[in-house]
Amino acid sequence: MERHMVRGQLYKHFDLERKNAKQAEARLDQRLQRLKVICLYHVKLLTWEQRQLQKELQRLQQAETMKKKFSSYLGNGFQKRPEDVLVFSPQGRQKHRAPQAKKMRALATRMAQDTCKSKSQVPPSHDAGLKDPMKSKKQPLSQNNRTACFIKEQPQAQEKDSVNPSKDVDPSKGISVPCQNQEVSTNTIEQGPSSSPASDSGMACADETRSKDVALKPDGNTGKQIPPKHMECAGSFEGEFTKPTFLELLSKARNAHYLRHRVPPESERLLSIGEIFGHGESSSSRAGKECENRVPSKFLPL
């Protein structure tokens, strides 16, 4: 009986050991599986990182090759361009490709030469829109041209007046004095007292230049030029090919003769002391003073 008891205990002990061994094996299997999963995960991660590194490597290599090509292209000083390179056909024939820039330059030079030749061959054409000078004689001159011409003809008129004195002549001075009712001829423009001498002289210079341009242009229909009577209105601008400077125009404007009124207005008449304080004066003395004030010094004959 004791043997059976001892064997039974031994069997139980062996069974427990077997169970423990089996449980340990199962645990080891589970741990192994976990380790395998972790290994697979790490392997996949490493492969992905390797692919990314390979892609970055390829990009860096391409960038280096492009930099080398660009540096060599710049180092040559743009002597060899991709357009100038020879292109070989599959049959083995060589075809030269001319650069587009050279073509454009050649076309531009040819066009410029053609235009220069055409301009040299064609004679200078005159404007056909100008009016006939004979017709322009019939039409009255403009006010600006009248003032310019009158400025030129003014000394001649004064000389005629000095040679042929009118009824109102001062015998002591030999100067023709206009009466109170007399005025400038209709060919001149009456300007108010507000007009300044600088503006009048500037207008006279501008009118002289315009009259010169109109006189020098020939007519397209008849081929005749404007008579020399109108050419005299050009004044000192005749024979000048360059535009005058501002200082020259200013000096001419200062030296230019201008007309306001042969008879100054009543508002500009100089009053005597007697007239200011209300004392009357004789009409004869007053008329003599008015005649003296009305004749400016610049209109006296030389």
Swiss-Prot record:
Extent of Basic and acidic residues compositional bias: 158-171, 207-216
Q: Which residues form a coiled coil?
A: 14-72
State which gene encodes it.
CCDC190
What keywords is this UniProt entry annotated with?
Coiled coil
Keyword Coiled coil listed: yes
Q: Compositional bias of type Polar residues: which residue ranges?
A: 178-199
Please give the residue ranges the record annotates as the region Disordered.
110-229, 278-302
Protein name in the entry:
Coiled-coil domain-containing protein 190
> Origin organism of this chain?
Homo sapiens
